[in-house]
Amino acid sequence: ADVPGNYPLDKNGNRYY
C-alpha cells in the first residue's frame, strides 16, 4: 500500500491513524 508518511499497519495491512 502507498503510505504517505509513517503509519503503522494492522495485521490486515490497513494503515491506522
Swiss-Prot record:
It is found in: Secreted. Transmembrane segments: none annotated. Keywords: Ion channel impairing toxin, Neurotoxin, Secreted, Toxin. GO terms for molecular function: ion channel regulator activity; toxin activity. Coiled coil: none annotated. One of its GO terms (cellular component) is extracellular region. Expressed by the venom gland. It comes from the Eukaryota. Binds to sodium channels and affects the channel activation process. Has high toxic effect on mice but no effect on B.fusca and C.partellus larvae. Belongs to the long (3 C-C) scorpion toxin superfamily. Sodium channel inhibitor family. This is Mammal toxin PlMT. It comes from Parabuthus liosoma (African black tail scorpion).
